[in-house]
Amino acid sequence: MSSGRVLVLALVLSACLFCGCISTDRPASSKEPGNVNVVATTVPLGHFTEMVGGDRVTVAVLVPPGTNLHTFEPSPSKLAEVEDADLYVKNGAGLEIWMERIIQANEEMLVVDSSSGVDLIESTDADDHGHGAHDFHEDILTTDPHIWLSPKNAIIIVDNICRGLTEVDPENAEFYQKNRDHYLSRLRELDGELNSTFSETDRKEFIVLHPSWSYFARDYGLVQVPILESEKEPGPRYLAEIVEVACEKRITTIFVDPNFNPKSAEIIAEEIDGRVVPLDPLAEDYIENMRIVGREIASSLDG
């Protein structure tokens, strides 16, 4: 065989390998050629991954927007999304109780625990997350999984994601690190803004339907007062206590998570002649959303 024909054959074989015509240990991926295929548990984690990965990553989110994180179960179609992933970004902190099923769907992908290095909050089953004064509940320690709702934690999470991308795609390490550094500077700026905002508020207590904001409260010296008891609708005694706290602390705003039934919040708001305001913990544009959250909570403390 001539050297020319050998060269042509080699080029054809190389092209087949690149296009997936020759099977490898991993199934063919539908991702953009050359991209790192990433699946993230939540919309914010997917957003962080895109901020670091830029056009070098293709990101899918496992838990769809508008879904209750605490009741979500991955369907077969969702598990199929994981099969081609190079990297899975999990929330950690006990959120993904179904994580073993994710790993079984793709044992070769790298799993990044975004909670690694975060100072986790342990709380009672009453969901007071260290910020309430309700001692009549059964004390069962759990871990608060809402770690991303703290700009300080977000800095740690973004760095964890960058490490994961660098491990699976070392050739683009400098690209990921540059994007990470740029986004971290924006997160630090956000943290500074929020520190300044809440240092000027005299009152610190705010009432929420679902206790998503424990880490946010810890960051800025606030006191979160939750309505829901362990994902269950509260009884009359607990509702009466919340109303008493609201009157004592001059609270007139009840913050609700759009993914939860607002009925209890509306009852309390009516009792205190207050208002119900939504705060979305899963909004896609993290920095803009946290600025909105900061403005709304600060406004409620000044009212």
Predicted regions and their residues:
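Extracytoplasmic metal-acquisition and chelation regions
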Residues: 21-303
